[in-house]
From Swiss-Prot:
This protein's name: Reticulon-4 receptor
Lipid-acceptor residues (GPI-anchor amidated serine): 447
LRR repeat residue intervals: 56-79, 80-103, 105-128, 129-152, 153-176, 178-200, 202-224, 225-248, 250-273
Phylogenetic placement of the source organism: Eukaryota, Metazoa, Chordata, Craniata, Vertebrata
Molecular-function GO terms, alphabetical: chondroitin sulfate binding; ganglioside GM1 binding; ganglioside GT1b binding; heparin binding; neuregulin receptor activity; protein-containing complex binding; Roundabout binding; signaling receptor activity
Residue ranges with Gly residues bias: 434-445
Location, primary (coarse class): membrane
Signal peptide segment: 1-26
GO-annotated cellular components: axonal growth cone; cell surface; dendritic shaft; external side of plasma membrane; glutamatergic synapse; growth cone; membrane raft; neuron projection
Topology within the bilayer: Lipid-anchor; GPI-anchor
Compositional bias ranges of the Basic residues kind: 413-429
Domain LRRCT, first and last residues per copy: 260-310
Length: 473
């Protein structure tokens, strides 16, 4: 009985103390105030058009969400030195005084989301909030992030900026957020990611950039993101990623790149090579160009599929034109550097042109090979061409009726090492080099070269003999 009586006395004492506290600490009329688990002033969905006065100074949590508050004046919560949580989301905020949160040095959570008319926040609004670890600014109609907006928020871990109208991501915006682990930027209109956009985010674990207009990512934009585990870039305007972009992401486990107009040509090789080594979970990377690869997953292509440079001939067009070329519109380099395999098809000075070489048969003006031009030419007409070994038919093919001119061989011309200075004669050297595959001096070119030589070089007697055998030149 004594134990039951003792328990009842304690309960009665607790109720009396709570009533006394409520009397001693007045609560705004539209609010409910309670002390457990933390001292709380709760005024949600009461139709309030302004921040209520008379909020208990001992409040640790203040809930003002779901009202019609349009403005937060300076020092609205200055007396609440112990405040750790402040919810102002889902109101009609169109402005916040730069000194509205002055004195809230212990504030940990600030929710300003779902205030579509806010649009602009003064860069000094969050100064002094050194303990803030969660900040909601999503769905606030923000068009820009002012310089220094997040300065001094060293404890911030969660930053929600999704579903705004952000049109740029300035350098060094998040530089002071060394402890930030989650950054939500999806659902904006960000067109590119500059070099220092994420500078200083050494602790970032999750970065959501999907559903923007991102067409370019600077090669070093992710340089400080060595701890990043989740990266969403789907539903953007990306057609390629530079080779260096993903290299710093040593901890990456989840990657989504789908719903982008990827160009799967030689410029996609760096991304393709990185994806072959990636051991985490990744989405498909469907190709947009060229047409022959449209819809196929870049990850599943062979290296040989990524040759040449595609042209933007498909239905895709980027968001902004500004009279740029297709490559500039797509954010692509203008051409690809040939790799080792590609270089084999590039004609080099001093090398014979292959049958499939694009330069074959092209002669610059004034570079016509020397010769009398009387017979058909079998030599490559390019400046770097050489006489094919089969260009000259054997002399036996030129004999009429089995006649054999005196002094000439009955077999095809034999390759000679060259003429010595002692016996070198013009006719001797030319006859010895015909059909050898070397252009030499360039005089013996074409199937009619030997008759021409006989006419122009031989002594008169030899010329007459050749005339009767071979016919006129």
């Amino acid at each position: 009985m004594k134990r039951a009586s003792s328990g009842g006395s304690r309960l009665l004492a607790w109720v009396l103390w709570l009533q006394a506290w409520r009397v001693a600490t007045p609560c705004p009329g539209a609010c409910v105030c309670y002390n457990e688990p933390k001292v709380t002033t709760s005024c949600p969905q009461q139709g309030l058009q302004a921040v209520p006065t008379g909020i208990p100074a001992s409040s640790q949590r203040i809930f003002l969400h779901g009202n019609r508050i349009s403005y937060v004046p300076a020092a609205s919560f200055q007396s609440c030195r112990n405040l750790t949580i402040l919810w102002l989301h889902s109101n009609a905020l169109a402005g916040i005084d730069a000194a509205a949160f002055t004195g809230l040095t212990l504030l940990e959570q600030l929710d300003l989301s779902d205030n579509a008319q806010l649009r602009v926040v003064d860069p000094t609004t969050f100064r002094g909030l050194g303990h803030l670890h969660t900040l909601h600014l999503d769905r606030c109609g923000l068009q820009e992030l002012g310089p220094g907006l997040f300065r001094g928020l060293a404890a911030l871990q969660y930053l929600y900026l999704q579903d705004n109208n952000l049109q740029a991501l300035p350098d060094n915006t998040f530089r002071d957020l060394g402890n930030l682990t989650h950054l939500f930027l999806h659902g904006n209109r960000i067109p590119s990611v500059p070099e220092h956009a994420f500078r200083g985010l050494h602790s970032l674990d999750r970065l959501l950039l999907h559903q923007n207009h991102v067409a370019r990512v600077h090669p070093h934009a992710f340089r400080d993101l060595g701890r990043l585990m989740t990266l969403y870039l789907f539903a953007n305007n990306l057609s390629m990623l530079p080779a260096e972009v993903l290299v710093p992401l040593r901890s990456l486990q989840y990657l989504r790149l789908n719903d982008n107009p990827w160009v799967c040509d030689c410029r996609a090789r760096p991304l393709w090579a990185w994806l072959q080594k990636f051991r985490g979970s990744s989405s498909e990377v469907p190709c947009n160009l060229p047409q022959r690869l449209a819809g196929r997953d870049l990850k599943r292509l062979a290296a040989s599929d990524l040759e040449g440079c595609a042209v933007a001939s498909g239905p895709f067009r980027p968001f902004q034109t500004n009279q740029l070329t297709d490559e500039e519109l797509l954010g692509l380099p203008k051409c690809c550097q040939p790799d080792a395999a590609d270089k084999a098809s590039v004609l080099e000075p001093g090398r014979p042109a292959s049958a499939g070489n694009a330069l074959k048969g092209r002669v610059p003006p004034g570079d016509t090979p020397p010769g009398n031009g009387s017979g058909p030419r079998h030599i490559n007409d390019s400046p770097f061409g050489t006489l094919p070994g089969s260009a000259e038919p054997p002399l036996t093919a030129l004999r009429p009726g089995g006649s054999e001119p005196p002094g000439l061989p009955t077999t095809g011309p034999r390759r000679r090492p060259g003429c010595s200075r002692k016996n070198r004669t013009r006719s001797h050297c030319r006859l010895g080099q015909a059909g050898s595959g070397s252009s030499g001096t360039g005089d013996a070119e074409g199937s009619g070269a030997l008759p021409a030589l006989a006419c122009s070089l031989a002594p008169l007697g030899l010329a007459l003999v050749l005339w009767t055998v071979l016919g006129p030149c």
